[in-house]
Amino acid sequence: SKAELIIAMAQLQHSEGLIICNGYKDAEFIDLGLYARQMGIPCFFVVETLSEVLIIIERSRALNIEPLIGVRIKTTVAVDGYWSQDSGDRSIFGLSTANLMELVDRLREAGLLHCLRLLHCHLGSQIPNIRNVRNGVLEACRFYSGLVQEGAPMCYLDLGGGLAVDYEGARTNSTHSMNYGLDEYCANIIESIRETLDP
């Protein structure tokens, strides 16, 4: 919300933190984020629909302030667990591969591809199987690498969701459990990123 963005701007005025703007973004919200950028606050707009990028481009031109842009991608990895029906290609959030390429084309045409610096994906919710987490991170890294090859100077990989709670205490990959601990979760994410992005 605009109120939350104003609070974040006040807190980060003399900090090295980032503001990541997900969710609904209208022209006023984008203007506010662009003013934050003008103040030296790194405020990213995470594009979740193609219509958002048109508003970002238009407001950026009107205010003559370059945006910081991120993109939320929809991975194809279907995950196990309670939310499996809404995972992978069936997810309603994020851009598909075709939409991602259209975003890149629109930013390139607008001369703003250099503003695309962050890739975000939400791996899922309450993922019981560590293999699903690893596969999701590997796919996100391939998207990240593809954006670099397209000419975007990527800097940030923002991985959300996934970490489960072992409600059963069974340490299995059943719907209400998890077959990994926090250390293994973190290690798998780091190893997957190194495996894909570290030359």
Set out the residue ranges of the language-model regions.
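Active-site anion/phosphate-binding pocket segments in diverse small-molecule metabolic enzymes
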Residues: 139, 161-199
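Active-site-proximal beta-alpha core segment in soluble small-molecule metabolic enzymes
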Residues: 2-156, 165, 181
